Amino acid sequence: MARTTSQLYDAVPIQSSVVLCSCPSPSMVRSQTEPGSSPGIPSGVSRQGSTMDGTTAEARPSTNPLQQHPAQLPPQPRKKRPEDFKFGKILGEGSFSTVVLARELATSREYAIKILEKRHIIKENKVPYVTRERDVMSRLDHPFFVKLYFTFQDDEKLYFGLSYAKNGELLKYIRKIGSFDETCTRFYTAEIVSALEYLHGKGIIHRDLKPENILLNEDMHIQITDFGTAKVLSPESKQARANSFVGTAQYVSPELLTEKSACKSSDLWALGCIIYQLVAGLPPFRAGNEYLIFQKIIKLEYHFPEKFFPKARDLVEKLLVLDATKRLGCEEMEGYGPLKAHPFFETITWENLHQQTPPKLTAYLPAMSEDDEDCYGNYDNLLSQFGFMQVSSSSSSHSLSTVETSLPQRSGSNIEQYIHDLDTNSFELDLQFSEDEKRLLLEKQAGGNPWHQFVENNLILKMGPVDKRKGLFARRRQLLLTEGPHLYYVDPVNKVLKGEIPWSQELRPEAKNFKTFFVHTPNRTYYLMDPSGNAHKWCRKIQEVWRQQYQSNPDAAVQ
């Protein structure tokens, strides 16, 4: 018979050093349970357990007379309550929890408080995951892992006060800037290696290491999170593997697929995938569905794009090895010493990584052909430049000042001839048409332009082929700038709309050279290359439309 919520919680000695997944954007928790896992949260305590009020108790019986008379114990600090905090925005939501930013009223300190519904934990059979994360987090004390500061409860919920990783997921920055330069890749890889060395030294396998589970604190150092699927290897047991299927498809190790087991070396495989993604912008194993991804993993089917850093490539090749006992860093390969001595880390000082200043995040955009040039972009500089994009009478002179400001003029007055002369694959319209002329243009576009089907009946103002880059990979796309405004991009071979660059007041074009131009948005920078060498024309036209939208229409700027 199922226990009531109060009975469940009475059986759970919640410790002040215990935490569930603290990721601001928790990944989906799996439904599999470990063989031998208790169906409920055990009522016993760990090696240094806690009573319900958070006091520490020894697991062994005590003959101390003071402990036999609870009334003689010194008073304990008052447990925190929900009313001690001002709760703010939601940082993330998981399958059975919500993480909320909260400020403690007495100290003004900020925490990421994870809130769990007791009843839902029982109903959805999530007790094993609560137990697992409790056991793992109670063993960790390292700057590269999330920290639990306190726990408390009310009648319906459990609350866990966690360190607030202010800068969010590492994945967010990979998506924003595409690929990291070598200095950034080296530093963050070193921090992950240092964290794994500590974790594996504690006999713990993470089993779901990926950029989503690596957070960045206020100082841009990593904090690894999400231990719901971790495994603690018993020191009394010779078993060095965990026998259950957990993880995320792109980072799953081959032994998990073929033997249904994971080991410490499985985390090293995930490390190899992460290094590859930091440099290339995408994980090494990609396909249309999980089955195809798994097939590529067990066949070791991946390739390095051109301009991949040679030393980083060598390191990845020594980590993405099908035989788990042959991966650099595993116990069979003499542990972490040889891994940390790899030439990729030759400039790293390992002793005090958490006290070092992380390098500024810088995008790496190597030239795609011999007549191009490498481009680098500083993420911090980009964010500071967004401040100059505000539309007001006092700041309009700063808006998009990096590109030309004059509007192109249409030559001649014969609109029919103008329409007739338009190329069906690449052209640019000016913005000086009357409403009747725009109507004629739209009619012509609807009747004869093969790209009209993708633009939601908006008039195309400029279009042409570009190479759209994501990390070190580039794909040919048809870029369509329309009224609205919109920036659509289409697969020209399969004739499929692939996406849209989001317009906002903060959007900013930037020409890097004749071919390469960026479109900066708050959440991502789009890297584009015009094969005709007219990047400046794209920037000029995007600027025109931006100005018409936000300077000619002040109401749009405040929406």
From Swiss-Prot:
> What EC number(s) does the entry state?
2.7.11.1
Q: Which reaction does it catalyse?
A: L-seryl-[protein] + ATP = O-phospho-L-seryl-[protein] + ADP + H(+); L-threonyl-[protein] + ATP = O-phospho-L-threonyl-[protein] + ADP + H(+)
Q: Offer one example of a GO biological process linked to this entry.
A: negative regulation of endothelial cell apoptotic process
How is the protein's activity regulated, according to its record?
A: Homodimerization regulates its activity by maintaining the kinase in an autoinhibitory conformation. NPRL2 down-regulates its activity by interfering with tyrosine phosphorylation at the Tyr-9, Tyr-376 and Tyr-379 residues. The 14-3-3 protein YWHAQ acts as a negative regulator by association with the residues surrounding the Ser-244 residue. STRAP positively regulates its activity by enhancing its autophosphorylation and by stimulating its dissociation from YWHAQ. SMAD2, SMAD3, SMAD4 and SMAD7 also positively regulate its activity by stimulating its dissociation from YWHAQ.
* List of residues binding ATP: 95-97, 114, 163-165, 169, 212, 226
Please give the GO cellular component terms listed in this UniProt entry. Answer: cell projection; cytoplasm; cytoplasmic vesicle; cytosol; focal adhesion; nucleus; plasma membrane; postsynaptic density
Record's compositionally biased regions (Low complexity): 35-44
Q: What job does the chain carry out? A: Serine/threonine kinase which acts as a master kinase, phosphorylating and activating a subgroup of the AGC family of protein kinases. Its targets include: protein kinase B (PKB/AKT1, PKB/AKT2, PKB/AKT3), p70 ribosomal protein S6 kinase (RPS6KB1), p90 ribosomal protein S6 kinase (RPS6KA1, RPS6KA2 and RPS6KA3), cyclic AMP-dependent protein kinase (PRKACA), protein kinase C (PRKCD and PRKCZ), serum and glucocorticoid-inducible kinase (SGK1, SGK2 and SGK3), p21-activated kinase-1 (PAK1), TSSK3, protein kinase PKN (PKN1 and PKN2).
Q: Which family does it belong to?
A: Belongs to the protein kinase superfamily. AGC Ser/Thr protein kinase family. PDPK1 subfamily.
User: What name does UniProt use for this protein?
Assistant: 3-phosphoinositide-dependent protein kinase 1
What is the species of this protein?
A: Mus musculus
